[in-house]
């Protein structure tokens, strides 16, 4: 049993358990901090049931688009059912550690609540960097601090007990290694927000 099994097993009850008024309010305040612009093309990695999608659509407007992927078949099914009415949202099965989108496809790539569950984080970041446009942004975010998240995963299931965010120095090193610049990390109770940019070609 692994993280994928955990998410497949919990997909049908995920929103009831985790999509609380607090989380909705948190996302309403968090997503505007991503720096997204109307009309942009955004990749939502590890979308789950799509908790981020309504907030992304609000920021991007009708001219923007969201491609949402998840490695859990059951999560994708839940997400497709919830958001089938949105014309500018595409939901599909995908793993960013393996998925190779075309070069310079997206203005921003968002990883909300997923980064600790990536087994090969360096490969995932390389793929994200490749598919980002020049000056594109990577956002890694959680509704808990890295320390709170570690304890949360240890508590909820043995399948995700070892899934955690690298320490700040390690995260910065990993991002620089995969070509990211302008790295900022906020890690405080109730919020983790990492924003980085793709190297600007001169």
Report each predicted region and the residues it spans.
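Class I SAM-dependent methyltransferase SAM/SAH-binding core
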Residues: 43, 49-98
């Amino acid at each position: 049993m692994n993280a994928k099994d955990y998410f497949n097993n919990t997909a049908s009850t995920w929103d009831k358990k985790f999509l609380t008024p607090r989380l909705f309010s948190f996302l309403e305040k968090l997503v505007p901090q991503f720096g997204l612009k109307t009309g942009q093309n955004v990749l939502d990695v590890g979308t789950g049931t799509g908790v981020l999608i309504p907030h992304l659509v609000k920021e991007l407007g009708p001219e923007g688009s969201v491609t949402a992927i998840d490695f859990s078949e059951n999560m994708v099914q839940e997400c497709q059912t919830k958001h089938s009415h949105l014309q500018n949202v595409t939901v599909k099965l995908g793993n960013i550690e393996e998925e190779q989108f075309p070069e310079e496809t997206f203005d921003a790539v968002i990883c909300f609540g997923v980064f600790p569950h990536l087994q090969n984080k360096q490969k995932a970041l390389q793929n994200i960097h490749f598919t980002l446009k020049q000056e594109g942004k990577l956002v890694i975010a959680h509704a808990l601090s890295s320390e709170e998240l570690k304890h949360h995963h240890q508590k909820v299931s043995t399948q995700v007990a070892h899934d955690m965010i690298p320490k700040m120095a390690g995260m910065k090193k990993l991002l620089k290694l995969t070509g990211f610049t302008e790295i900022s990390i906020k890690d405080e109770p109730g919020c983790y927000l990492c924003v980085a940019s793709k190297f600007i070609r001169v």
